[in-house]
Every structure is written in C-alpha cells, then in structure tokens.
Swiss-Prot record:
It is found in: Cytoplasm. The lineage of its organism: Bacteria, Pseudomonadati, Pseudomonadota, Betaproteobacteria, Burkholderiales. GO terms for cellular component: cytoplasm. The active site is at D383. This is Isocitrate dehydrogenase kinase/phosphatase. It catalyses: L-seryl-[isocitrate dehydrogenase] + ATP = O-phospho-L-seryl-[isocitrate dehydrogenase] + ADP + H(+). Residues 589-608 are annotated as: Disordered.
Length: 608
C-alpha cells in the first residue's frame, strides 16, 4: 500500500530536501577535490601527504552528515517534523535528483542523515531509500567541457605502440618518463606473452577510464581491450623510479590480478569521478562477479558500498532459508562471531565482558577498528563494515547462536516484531581461518600458508602495524590465497612498541621457571618468544624456518621500527614483484636500481 501524499504541499518539506542535497553536494565536492589534490601530491612524490589526505577523506563523510543534521535541527526542528512532511521531504528530494550525476550517493547521504534523526521504526521505503529511486543506467556528464567516463582508442589507425603512448601521455602527468618507449615495448611484449599474436577484429579498440587511480606510491591506468567478442581487462601502475622521473611498472592483464588490487583488504583509491555509477559499471565489466558494493567501497565511496551491501543482505535473506550459526573455529575472548553459510561474510560483535588476560574496553576495541580503517591496509588487513541497529529475523537464527548472543552480548540486543535487533556489529568478508587451513592442508598448502603468513606480518611491520596477537587463528586465507589479518583488538603501532630481547636467565631456577624472570612493560614485545606458539606442528616448523627464520630475531623488528621513526615509507606492490618490467624484462633496463628498489629484490614487498 502506498502511503505517500497525493499533493506536495509542504514548503518545509521542499526546503529540508534542498538543504540536504546542498550538504551532499558539498560533501561530494570535497571528495572530488581530494582526488585532484592526490594527483598533485603524487607528482611531487609527497607520500606522507598522500597518506594524510587518504586518512582525512575517510572521516569527511561523517563530518558532513553531522553538519547537515545540526542544520536541520537548528533551522527546521527536524525531530518534530510530522510523518506526512517527512514523506514529502523524500519525494521532493527524488524530484531534485532527476538530473543529478551522483543520485545513488545522494540517496545514501539522505539515509545517513535520516538515521540520525528518525527512530528505526521509520527505516522503511516510505521515509528513506531502502531501494533506489533514481536509475543510474546510461548516466553520463553531457556538459561540453566535461571529461567522458572513458575514452576509446583505435590502434588500427596509428598502430598499437603509438596508441599506448597516447593513452599514457593524455593523463598529462607533470614529471617526465624515464623511457616511455622502453616501457611501451614492455607492455606490448607482456600482451604478446599473455595472449599470443591475435588478429585485430574490425572492432579492435581500447577503452581507458579518464581518471587515474591513486594509492600508496602508484597511479593506475585502468581500462579494457575489446577485440571481436573478447573483453580483456588491464591496469598499468605508474611509479616514480628516480627523483622527478616516472615509469610504467608493469601491466596487469588477468582478471584475478585486478580483483586483488580492488580487494577488500586494500585501502581505498583516490579517483576523481564525475559520475561514479558510470565508473563502477565500467569496472564491473572487467571484474564480473565482484559485488558493486565492494567496487564502490574500493573507489572511496565506502558509505555507498555499505548501503549496497545491506541491500544485498536483505535481498539474500528474502531468497534463502538457511540459518545464522556460530562461526566455525576457535571462539574469541573479545568478539562473538557468527555467519550465514550461504552468504560469504561474518558478523562480529564486541562482547559485554572479557575474561582474563584481556584488559580492554568496548571503546578501545572500536578505536582499534577505526585505526585499521584509517591506516594503509596494504592488502593484509580486512576492511570492516560497521552497522548499528541491525534487525535479523529470529526465525533465521540458530538456537545455539541465540543462546550465545543472550549470554555474551545481552546489552546489545532488543526483540522487536519477530526480529532480533543488534545495536552494533562489524561485518567482514569470510575467509578460511589460517589455523584450520594449516591443520587440514596438504604439504604444498602448508608451505604456501606459512610463507604468506610471514610475508603478511613482515609487510604489516614495515607499515607500522604490530598485530599484537599473532596466533594463526587471527589470520585468514582469501579466495585468492592471500593471508590477511582480521583480529584487531590488540593491534598497536610498531613505533609505540618496545622491541626487546629476552635477557639471559640469572640462574638455574630462572632457566627452569615457567614464568618470565624479567619485567615486561605494557608495550614490550619479545619476537624470540613467538616460536612455541607458532612452531608446534613439525610440518609448519620446517617450512617456517625455511622461509622466515629471521621472524624471531628482535633485530628484524627493530630495523623496521628504526626506518619508520626516520620517516621512511617502504615500497609495496599489490602484485608479485616478478611481474615488474624491470624484473620480467631485465635486458631492457640498465643495471641502476630504481627509486622503488630501496630494499633488495628479495625483500620487495607484495601486498595483494
């Protein structure tokens, strides 16, 4: 039944809708300005500035929402607006969006504002956008001076090499390239190596998104090659190789490699998008099967991704019948974790009380999750979606799960109209817990898992992250085989830690003691003590010592800390370093190491 008013008679309704849209437009203008600033910082190789910009942008959305709420409260007494006017506000807002270029994001902003003003009983499609109202299909900025979402290039006219060079130079990056002709030759060789020689069909063309994607120390060109009925995705990372000189680092030509650089374990890109839905639609064509929610999140529109994810969850619940269950694996001391087997995510709730030896609070744990959200995750820490007042049908909850919820988190539960409302939770991609992966794995899988675990911790270390609890159960294996950290309640900055060696025992009594014979401060870490917790399985021990024997040496950890304190930002690559042109085609390069090779090739970091 449609409860909407037949006439839009409320001037307040129109004024409130217009005020909300003006506030959204301000938010999106700031969002785009950040992407423009990212290009300038990248050209200057100001990596600390880029990090700072990315952190500030994450909190910008919530700041704009709060500003809008305060304006509506002060000027319109929003909490006391009656229901009919609120319905008119939504209809006026829809009318204002008919020619808007970010309507889906504006609808999400409307929801965010309303959720801070209205009671959750109003969270239905009469008052907020449970479903989208404005279509984004074929949406494009048709103003004469506007950049198109993507540009089409036709190699049949000028040849592939000239076309590729024009694609790169059209981005008008300020530093010159060290040797663009060499790099274009590497791209063409990589295409031949991957696909062999292929005949150009009449429709042979290359589509390239008009804006660069900035993250860490790279700027990515993203596009697709179309030839006959084939659509071939590609991404080309551009990096500084010497002060004031750029180079194409590689070309990624496989869908799985693109899915990794756009994965949930990486920080968000900075990319200037006039019509974000058009960018997302394009990315969906080169990464089919990747949820739109994840793509919106990866390009920095995490609130839109969060909104789409929740719609996906509701849609899945209406088309499935299995029950939420307690997640398999070792139960945590701090979080209660459950999952829906048919849905590839886990739901995590902070418990009301924590048994010893945990000494923390709900507020401290929430701050740890915010730390991870703001930090560069490097492909080694899972992103989380944070929700309030999530209503799940009681009929879909396993009885054992309900009992566990009532036991561990009673303060966060409300029963309402056949639903269990959870006041606060986090949602993450479901992964195979590393302890189960190693426990059940073949010899090859164990070697892969252990090698990945060591790489993950070492990369986190160089990014100033100390995981705290390094047990295998706190890491997961993604569908791409990457090991990712996902338990954040003990996480610390490495620079806040005091790396120590275990002092020698003073006497035989110390040596035989089951307790430390030395004082341990709250931020002291002793890498050499991790062995008993990580090397109990002989198969694990053998491969661990083969690949990561230095893991237990305090000098490794201290060296990373020292570099961080000196302001160094290491190089990380979201692809295997063997794909880098300088490694793959060394004969095309001179022997002088580039600026991205501060570490030896063997130490070069991967963060997939």
């Amino acid at each position: 039944m449609n409860h909407f008013p037949k006439l839009l008679s409320s001037q307040i309704g129109f004024d409130v809708a217009q005020t909300m849209l003006e506030n959204f437009d301000r938010h999106y203008r700031i969002f785009r300005e950040a992407a423009v600033d990212a290009k300038t910082l990248y050209e200057r190789a100001d990596w600390h500035g880029l990090q700072r910009l990315a952190r500030e942008r994450i909190t910008s959305y919530d700041d704009r929402v709060q500003e809008c709420v305060e304006v509506l409260q002060d000027e319109y007494d929003a909490e006391n607006i009656d229901d009919e006017v609120w319905q008119q506000i939504k209809l006026h807002y829809i009318g204002l969006l008919t020619s808007h270029r970010q309507p889906e994001c504006a609808e999400t902003f409307f929801n965010s504002v309303c959720c801070k003003i209205l009671h959750r009983s109003y969270f239905n499609n009469d008052f907020i956008f449970v479903r989208p109202a404005i279509s984004t299909e074929y949406l494009e900025n048709d103003e004469p001076a506007a950049k198109p979402t993507y540009r089409a290039y036709y190699p049949g006219t000028d040849g592939l090499a000239a076309t590729l060079e024009r694609i790169v130079t059209n981005f008008q990056l300020e530093p010159p390239f060290e040797d663009l002709t060499r790099d274009i030759g590497c791209v063409m060789q990589a295409i031949t190596d991957e696909f062999g020689e292929f005949d150009a069909a009449p429709n042979f063309q290359i589509h390239v998104l008009s804006s660069l994607f900035f993250r860490n120390k790279s700027a990515y060109i993203v596009g697709r090659i179309i030839n006959a009925d084939r659509v071939l995705p590609f991404a080309v990372p551009i990096r500084h190789v010497r002060p004031g000189l750029l180079a194409l680092d590689t070309v990624l030509l496989r869908r799985d490699l693109l899915q990794i650089i756009f994965s949930f374990s990486h920080s968000y890109f900075l990319v200037d998008m006039g019509v974000p839905s058009a960018y997302v639609d394009f990315l969906c064509t080169i990464m089919p099967g990747k949820p739109k929610a994840e793509i919106y999140t990866s390009v920095g529109l995490q609130k839109q991704g969060k909104n789409l994810f929740y719609r996906d969850l509701l849609h899945h619940l209406s088309h499935s019948s299995d029950r939420f269950i307690i997640a398999p694996g070792i139960k945590g001391l701090v979080m209660l974790v459950f999952t829906l087997p048919s849905f590839p995510y886990v739901f995590k709730i902070i418990k009301d009380h924590f048994p010893p030896p945990k000494e923390t609070t709900r507020e401290q744990i929430m701050e740890k999750y915010q730390l991870v959200k703001r930090h560069d995750r490097l492909g080694r820490m899972a992103d989380t979606l944070e929700y309030s007042s999530v209503a799940l049908p009681i009929s879909r909850l396993d009885h054992a799960l309900v009992r566990e919820l009532e036991k561990e988190v009673p303060s966060l539960l409300e029963y309402e109209d056949g639903n269990l409302v959870i006041k606060h939770l986090y949602i993450e991609r479901r992964m195979i817990p590393l302890n189960l992966y190693l426990q059940n794995g073949t010899d090859a899988e164990i070697e892969h898992g252990v090698k990945e675990y060591g790489n993950a911790v070492k990369e986190l270390m160089k990014a100033n992250i100390f995981p705290g609890d390094m047990l295998y159960k706190n890491f997961g294996v993604t569908r791409h085989g990457r090991v990712v950290f996902y338990d954040y309640d003990e996480i610390e900055y490495l620079t806040d830690c005091n790396v120590r060696r275990v002092p020698p025992p003073r006497n035989e009594e110390d040596e035989l003691s089951g307790e430390p014979w030395y004082t341990v401060g709250p931020h002291d870490i002793f890498p050499e003590t991790y062995g008993p917790f990580l090397l109990g399985d002989p198969r694990v021990r053998a491969v661990f010592m083969k690949h990561h024997a230095d893991f237990f040496e305090a000098s490794l950890w201290q060296a990373s800390k020292d570099k961080l304190l000196q302001g160094e930002l290491p190089d990380f690559y979201p692809y295997d370093v063997s794909l880098r042109f300088s490694v793959r085609y060394p004969d095309r390069f001179d022997s002088t190491p580039d600026a991205g090779d501060g570490d030896s090739a063997g130490d070069a970091q991967r963060a997939a």
